[in-house]
Amino acid sequence: MAPLALVGVALLLGAPHCLGEATPTPSLPPPPANDSDASPGGCQGSYRCQPGVLLPVWEPDDPSLGDKAARAVVYFVAMVYMFLGLSIIADRFMASIEVITSKEKEITITKANGETSVGTVRIWNETVSNLTLMALGSSAPEILLSVIEVCGHNFQAGELGPGTIVGSAAFNMFVVIAVCVYVIPAGESRKIKHLRVFFVTASWSIFAYVWLYLILAVFSPGVVQVWEALLTLVFFPVCVVFAWMADKRLLFYKYVYKRYRTDPRSGIIIGAEGDPPKSIELDGTFVGTEVPGELGALGTGPAEARELDASRREVIQILKDLKQKHPDKDLEQLVGIAKYYALLHQQKSRAFYRIQATRLMTGAGNVLRRHAADAARRPGANDGAPDDEDDGASRIFFEPSLYHCLENCGSVLLSVACQGGEGNSTFYVDYRTEDGSAKAGSDYEYSEGTLVFKPGETQKELRIGIIDDDIFEEDEHFFVRLLNLRVGDAQGMFEPDGGGRPKGRLVAPLLATVTILDDDHAGIFSFQDRLLHVSECMGTVDVRVVRSSGARGTVRLPYRTVDGTARGGGVHYEDACGELEFGDDETMKTLQVKIVDDEEYEKKDNFFIELGQPQWLKRGISALLLNQGDGDRKLTAEEEEAQRIAEMGKPVLGENCRLEVIIEESYDFKNTVDKLIKKTNLALVIGTHSWREQFLEAVTVSAGDEEEDEDGSREERLPSCFDYVMHFLTVFWKVLFACLPPTEYCHGWACFGVCILVIGLLTALIGDLASHFGCTVGLKDSVNAVVFVALGTSIPDTFASKVAALQDQCADASIGNVTGSNAVNVFLGLGVAWSVAAVYWAVQGRPFEVRTGTLAFSVTLFTVFAFVGIAVLLYRRRPHIGGELGGPRGPKLATTALFLGLWFLYILFASLEAYCHIRGF
């Protein structure tokens, strides 16, 4: 209502002129006949409307007072409705920009041990995207309005486009910042994190309006020359380059190589400054690159290198906190909560906050809650996937495929299984033995034959004879193979081969291995391997100790753990010390060690398990021979030979008597962290993948729940009356814009291009409606632009900044982009429009004339007030306030009142100058 009140004041001030009771100031030149406003340089508004770019004049052009009031209401309502449509199409436009700027490329990452892996690097620099596509997305209506106004009115300068740019800049600088300062909860504050970038963009914002004043009032008053217009346009890329240099610290430091850091907002690797290397090292160093002495001595990299795992640590901490908060939930449930938590707390782009604010206003619901609900309803990628092996055929195989037996056992029994299928066929499968180190005839009996599985039978056994001898020898093995499967009917009659689906097939394991253990030795004791990799989440690891080359007698085997880089005593694992007792003919024992789960993303610590000398407890004749004799009697030759043979049979340690255990990170936990990081890419949240999804969103009403709970466990709230009203007011626009290409198509560029065209069309309509509304009520275009049009184009940005101020931990997303957008509006909005017009009139041999009075005054007024506002923001960074936003109640209210007062004064002075109550330039 404040803008309406100010306009009312302005109308009262200019009322005598509008009613024809006064004449223009004699000292001012007469207005040109072709201007839509009868007197752009004069003092009165005009009731005579001119045709717009798209809308014709509403005939008759001299209506009665009642018709004027009705027309004004129609124009105003239509303009508000167009602003709603503009907000919704800007929502789609910003979503496409988020998808474009989130594009990534792959790089090769080389670990310190030489291993390589593939990582992702964001192509767009965050600062560059904020000043280019993001600024274009939030300021597209103002920029296109200026361009369309000039091009649609025979390349003549108007007041609506430039006035909207300056008025929007004032609204953003004063009202948006005032709202952001006020909404921060008591006792909290927000600071700008990237202060260097803010300084650069703020300086360019001030310079942009100083440059406008120089063009309009100093260099060539009343005329915009070609070089001035083109230089204004060139300042845009120069501003972007300076901001990029500030972000990379190239203005202060020199870098000779490129580093990468992990962006805490999206969890992906972002390239830093310098020349790109072919590959990078995960420890912060690079292939073919020397590390500076100080960094190499400390063993740490610079700040960017130390931030490499920042986002992963955040996700890991989230999971740990959620485990403590919800001890009764399993990992899958915790992951679902963590996904929402990570989305809620990560830093977000301005595009996201703009989209979130628009959808909350139009009854489309909370973006994050909708994404979390869709993810919960969406089945897993593997759910319901058909089993390739479940094709209706019976599967025949050995179960198990490994067998051990002593050479004195006589025979070994092997099992063959038949699983699956319909169970109404007879299967014939052949088997035969094959030599390994054991030979048929000397170590085992050669065997071959046929197994018959009748309908309903699921298991068959076959027996192989083992040959015993009295010769001490190493363990030996042989094989048994399944082959030549035939299928019969239920009565056992063979069926002819058909071209249909097979009823049975042989599957792995088709080969069984039988190991024959020598029974003439107490055994050789060792671990199965020298190295064992375990995950820290295992809890307890089972380590097998095998007894080979014999299993005679009872043997006690001591063992103990020894620290390596991993520490016992409950730090990384629990110490283990004890004895394993192998009974007669027992060939395997298991010892257990408890592993401590630290929930680390990357881990590689080791410890050792050592076996002690085996002790022979219950012995046979060999033990008696070993103990035979005393120190006084010399053994006979026969006794010495017997003792030598017995010595060969005593238990000993094998080659693998020391096992290295390497504790690694949990792969499930690591994959969970990676999935959480991947899922929090905001392009996946706000983008669309199909027209079906877009139309479903368009016709669905959702609750506009702006406040977020920590874990998303709150029950979903029903839409309010306001949500339903806003949905039905905007459902036409939602369904219409659902016809646009989804943001996923062509990496967002298809939606981007179509949105530009639609925004241009709506902007042209808004410009015509605003001009016709102004001429209907006698309101000058310059006042109409700084109040109604600027307000309509800036309302979504206000809500977006409010949401960003509340949810972000810093002030960059809420106010840090305001200054950048203001500079971009001038350099692009006026630079493009004036460059086209100046070149056009230069070709015609005539100058491009711009009426300087109102615009130059507004620019000067805004520049002075902007200096005051930026100075206040910088002062608020002092410790007793804490930051640009929020702070103690007194300074917060004072800052809010000051910024709102500056905006009211700007509107008031601009209106007074437009109606000649105060003199401008």
UniProtKB/Swiss-Prot annotation:
Subcellular localization(s) per the UniProt record: Cell membrane; Basolateral cell membrane; Perikaryon; Cell projection, Dendrite
Reactions catalysed according to its record: Ca(2+)(in) + 3 Na(+)(out) = Ca(2+)(out) + 3 Na(+)(in)
UniProt activity-regulation remark: Calcium transport is down-regulated by Na(+) and stimulated by Ca(2+).
Membrane topology type: Multi-pass membrane protein
Region Disordered, residue ranges: 23-42, 372-391
Keyword Flavoprotein appears in the UniProt entry: no
Cytoplasmic side: 91-130, 186-196, 247-720, 771-772, 844-854, 910-921
Tissue: Detected in neocortex and hippocampus on pyramidal cells, astrocyte processes and dendrites (at protein level). Brain and skeletal muscle.
GO cellular component, one term: plasma membrane
Binding site for Ca(2+) 5: E536, D598, E600, E665
Residues annotated for Ca(2+) 1 binding in this entry: E407, D443, D469, E473
Region (Putative calmodulin-binding region): 248-267
Stretches of the chain forming a coiled coil according to its record: none
Protein origin, superkingdom: Eukaryota
Membrane-spanning parts: 69-90, 131-152, 165-185, 197-219, 223-246, 721-740, 748-770, 773-791, 823-843, 855-875, 893-909
Binding residues for Ca(2+) 2: E407, D468, D469, D519, D520
Main location: membrane
Residues that hold Ca(2+) 4 according to the record: D443, D469, E473, E476
Function, in words: Mediates the electrogenic exchange of Ca(2+) against Na(+) ions across the cell membrane, and thereby contributes to the regulation of cytoplasmic Ca(2+) levels and Ca(2+)-dependent cellular processes. Contributes to cellular Ca(2+) homeostasis in excitable cells. Contributes to the rapid decrease of cytoplasmic Ca(2+) levels back to baseline after neuronal activation, and thereby contributes to modulate synaptic plasticity, learning and memory. Plays a role in regulating urinary Ca(2+) and Na(+) excretion.
Family statement: Belongs to the Ca(2+):cation antiporter (CaCA) (TC 2.A.19) family. SLC8 subfamily.
NCBIfam families for the chain: caca (TIGR00845)
Protein's name according to its UniProt entry: Sodium/calcium exchanger 2
Lineage: Eukaryota, Metazoa, Chordata, Craniata, Vertebrata
